[in-house]
Amino acid sequence: MNYDAGNLSTYVYKELGGKLQLAAWDFNNGFDNYQWFHTETDRLYTVENSWFDRLWQDESFKEHVCERYRQLRETTLADEHIAEKIASYQAELGAAVDRNFKVWGYSFDENLLVGTDKEGRSRDIGSYEAAMKQLTDTIRERLAYLYKELGGN
């Protein structure tokens, strides 16, 4: 989930003789990590972009997207598989998490924290544990929404 997908953090390319490919540029604002506001998990952000809006008008395209999502939700995007992947990435990071916070931990100083949403709530993450909770909660909520929107019908 990347609120600026299709606008800032994605690009389209095509190899000679190949199909159009969509790729992510970065995920710095993905998974509810945007500094200035909470990213809702229950909307399709890409349809706000004219490219995707036009694609989404094509019934065949929609059917293919929904079918592919149903397939992936049973394997790669299954809750259990996602949890295992996150756990394996955490294990791989190991002590690097502590080293990162030794170098960059000052960025959590309350005098430096600037991200608040429109209700005045802090958008700044204060710990690795809080960041992981936000990430896993956001992914779980997002997958449930997408199943309802794309795969459960």
Predicted segments with their positions:
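Middle-to-C-terminal accessory/interaction subdomains
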Residues: M1-N153
